Design a protein with these regions (language model features):
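Low-complexity, Ser/Thr/Pro/Gly-rich disordered linker/stalk regions
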Residues: 1-302
Length: 302
């Protein structure tokens, strides 16, 4: 991504972001074979098509992962990017009513609501009729209705560069409905390694860190990651069983044990689990040019 490639809008006013990623979790026509005709279109509207596909790692299970990255020597130490992450799978039919009640709506009820409102991120707005410059009827967002839909939060595990460091960050959220205002997020440069930053429901832990200058350049670096995903208590919002994280880094016939099978809170209290994606995920409003190579992803359940 170049300096002018931050084109995704809808975040903070006047802020755009840059993304270029490949996801291991996806669905094909075969995954919808035998389902009712409207199953696919309904899933599109609810943004849950990928929930029907391959690559999902259920909450509370144990997995081994591997992938490789090649960082060019000319990459600036000022970049702020996540190059690999495991993401949660929020269910948008989980909603919060104006009176604060959290409930899971039947798909038909959620879709009926969606027909009468405008949903942006996690906020539900009144749908207001207006006309565009050509005189055509269009809908725009009016006042917030007080309803919110589940949108997810920070990735449960991320590998990236920020503030002149390479870092591995694990996040946990035991809240049944994600509180987007709870910005519990460990700073890659300031947080102590393996000392979680916590709020009432969340934990964010820098599991490993090294100066950007020490990260191997112009060669393939292979990561082997073993995760026992934390088991959560659903609506009870409890930790049933903490997780574990083990990370090896290999290059030039050498290995480095970055995270030594540490007990850690890692995951989200979603009904579904997690999926892997890698690429360029610019963080914040960074426009520093980013280019690197990624390859060799594989996962298996242990």
């Amino acid at each position: 991504l170049g300096r002018d490639d931050n084109t995704l809008e809808g975040y903070a006013p006047g802020e755009t972001k840059g993304r270029s990623e490949l996801a291991w979790c996806y669905a094909t026509a075969a995954d919808f074979a035998g389902l009712p005709d409207k199953a696919y279109s309904d899933a599109q509207r609810m943004k849950t098509v990928y929930h029907h596909g391959k690559g999902i790692c259920p909450q509370g299970t144990s997995w081994s992962y591997t992938f490789a990255v090649r960082i060019p020597a000319e990459l600036s130490p000022e970049v702020s990017t996540i190059f690999a992450q495991w993401h949660g799978m929020p269910d948008r039919t989980l909603v919060t009513a104006p009176d604060g009640r959290v409930m899971k709506l039947p798909a038909e009820e959620f879709l009926a609501m969606q027909d009468t409102v405008i949903i942006k991120k996690d906020i539900v707005y009144e749908r207001v009729e207006t006309v565009d410059t050509k005189g055509n009827k269009v809908w725009k967002a009016g006042k917030p209705t007080g309803w919110k839909v589940e949108q997810g939060g920070y990735p449960p595990l991320a590998f990236g560069f920020s503030n002149g460091y390479f870092y591995i960050k694990a996040n946990s959220d035991r809240r049944w409905f994600t509180d987007k205002t709870d910005r519990c997020n460990a700073n890659a440069a300031k947080a102590k390694v393996m000392v979680p930053v916590t709020s009432e429901f969340k934990a964010s832990t820098i599991a490993a860190r090294m100066p950007f200058s020490e990260f191997p350049k112009d060669r393939w670096v292979t990561f082997t990651v073993e995760i026992d995903w934390t088991q959560y208590g659903g609506e009870a919002e409890t930790i049933v069983r903490p997780g574990r994280l083990d990370v090896w880094m290999a290059h030039d016939s050498r290995t480095n044990h970055l995270v030594d099978n540490e007990q850690i809170l890692i995951g989200r209290n979603d009904e579904d689990g997690y999926y892997f994606k890698f690429g360029i995920y610019r963080v914040g409003d960074s426009t520093e040019p980013v280019s690197y190579n990624l390859a060799g992803y594989a996962q298996r359940q242990r």
